[in-house]
Amino acid sequence: MFKKSYRHNIALVGASEFFGFFGITSFWLLFLSQHGMSFGQIGILESLFHLTSLLSEVPSGVLADRFTYRTNLYLGRLMSILSCLFMLFGQGHFWIYAFGMVLNAWAYNFDSGTSTAMLFESAKEAGLEDKFLKFSSFVSAVAEATRTLGAVVAGFFVHGLLDMTYVIQIFFSLIVIILITMMKEPAFK
């Protein structure tokens, strides 16, 4: 039976970064274009994503301070799943895609810094605080590599199958939820 521990959290954070930020939906611009969005609409949707992310960064940080790390990580994955569902069922409707982009920005905001804080607190609780930079560098490298790998894999779906990338992202988000469940919440923040 799996026993929750701070040492296990270190590997679990790395695995959640791998699946959570796989980059499989990297071709979202092409996805929107294939679903009838004009370049102007795509530009507005991207602007909406970045504006939402900018305006939500501080409030999501307040929530991170108010609730547990795991709660924020769960919320991030829930937002990711909902965002993917809106993108899948948007069927060319601008406002549905717009709401999906807002949810996607919130998914990033809820994770922003939370996984790093979880990693730091876990390393500290495990008595490995002096190795935090090594762990953090490794997790960052995993995240960057998986974004690239995800984009390469997504390339196989560009000819009319980009919907599948959102299905895969939902599946990966469910895996991350399982990984979060296996994490031990740090005793204090």
Which sequence ranges carry the predicted segments?
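Helix-loop boundary and gating motifs at the non-cytosolic
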Residues: 2-55
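Helix-loop junctions at membrane interfaces in 12-TM secondary transporters
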Residues: 4-7, 88-101
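Cytoplasmic helix-loop-helix junction between adjacent transmembrane helices
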Residues: 102-143
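Transmembrane alpha-helix termini and helix-breaking/packing motifs in multi-pass membrane transporters
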Residues: 29, 34, 147-168
